Amino acid sequence: MLSEIKLSATFIDSSSKRKITDCNDIDVDKELGYTIGPDGIEYGIHKGLSEELYRDAEAVNASFIKAFARPENTMAHLKAGNGDKAIAVSTAAIGSFVHAAVLENREQEFEMWHGTTRQGNFKAHEYELAAEGKKLLTSKEYQAALGAIEAVRNSKPMRWFLDHPQTVKELSIFVKDPVYDMTLKARADAYNIENGYLVDLKTCASAAPEVFQKAVYDYGYDLQFAHYDFFFF
């Protein structure tokens, strides 16, 4: 998704905070809300905040909203974090590769398996790579990911956006809801400071417009966009 946002960005450099123990003064109201105290993670747009710190900061995010929007979900479902429609393992693997390659140039962390997954040494090699922080993909998954990566990099608007000197990637955003006094959070894939564009990179099993449109609603990406809309408009 590429959307134009209106935000005067003041960035907070949080690259030195790499573990949750670096921010153990976060004050969270476990029962009534999701408030991050003034001595914890600051409200604003963070550059370099680790994914661990972002995920451990208890605040309302898009996943919570997507789960809450489904009337069949109880609070137990929401707390367990299983309200989302499950993404197939293969689709998730492709998405991880595309995200890492396009936004972070980390293609080297993914390898292609040339045999079948039924071979005994597939799992053994998968575990070996996991210990090194790498991921093993099947030949079909790897080739599908390469096709998606090439499509993004060959897109003129995306090429302009990714290469722009004012584009900042992997931002963590925390804001306070003025009505309900709750902390909201979002982790944006990339934001262009100069032009006010926000990008969230999504992969889909098919690029056919009708299939992609259905997937957007099936996986609650429309609600995720609405969550970002609250942040920035």
Describe these PLM feature segments.
Residues 2-185:
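Metal-dependent nuclease catalytic cores that hydrolyze phosphodiester bonds in DNA/RNA
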Residues 164-233:
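Mg2+/Mn2+-dependent nuclease catalytic core
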